[in-house]
Amino acid sequence: MVDVILAAAIGLIWGSFIATLVLRWPAGRSVHGRSRCDACGQTLGVRDLVPLLSALARRGRCRHCGAAIDPFHARVELGAAMIGVVALAIVPGPAGWLWAAFVWLLLPLALLDARHLWLPDRLNAVLAAVGLLLAGPMLGTSLLDRWIGALAGGLALALLGWSYRRLRGGEGMGGGDPKLVAAIGCWIGWQALPLMLLLASLSGLVWALATQGKGDRPLAARRVPFGLFACIAAFAAVPLWLWLSGR
């Protein structure tokens, strides 16, 4: 129970940073320095920056000018806290902490792809490096398993993108998608990679069909944030693989 509460607290703090990063980075604004109200520019104090609680206490408004604070902050903080709670409740111990860390690192990538169709190389590199260094106990994979997962995942997506360009004469996949899948392979190894790709493909297809409106472009011509669905699938693949493999 202590681990679950601690994971929720860490998630709230991490979520606060991630929300700031996702809102500022694409706009070319620094993610460092003191936080300010977007409406009045007033520097926010410590009591204004307590994750989730400050927003609840101020009813989602700036203490200085009364302007509404973007609810995106609170949603990301709550989502990151729930990631920690779910991970440690389902998979106690070191494997659960690694699962939580994995998804916390996936969170900014998922949000940036959903909002901007952008998967920054730097975030993919951090995800990959941490996975190669630390992820072994999460699914019981060896370093070789994770290297093979990275190479197989990255090459499979790159080959798929190349084939689409050859057949259709246009881009069917963003350049960050193969790098993201390679980075995910650094965490889950080659064994769970097919499950993750299957879940990502199915969820992306369901989303595309569910959001297809009359008069929209054909499905083949629509831009789907595959990175978002790869992140969601990676989250789900960890407990599913542990269950399927009897670990």
Label the model's feature ranges.
Residues 14-19, 80, 84, 134, ...:
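Alpha-helical transmembrane segments of multipass membrane proteins
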Residues 1-26, 121:
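Long, highly hydrophobic alpha-helical transmembrane signal-anchor segments
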Residues 18-75, 226:
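Membrane-proximal soluble regions of multi-pass membrane proteins
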Residues 239-247:
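Juxtamembrane boundary at the C-terminal end of a transmembrane helix
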Residues 7, 97, 101-207, 246-247:
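Functional transmembrane core segments of multi-pass inner-membrane proteins
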Residues 72-80, 96-100, 213-226:
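Hydrophobic alpha-helical transmembrane segments and immediately flanking/interface helices
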Residues 174-176, 209-236:
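Interfacial loop-to-transmembrane junctions
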Residues 86-98:
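Transmembrane helix-loop-helix
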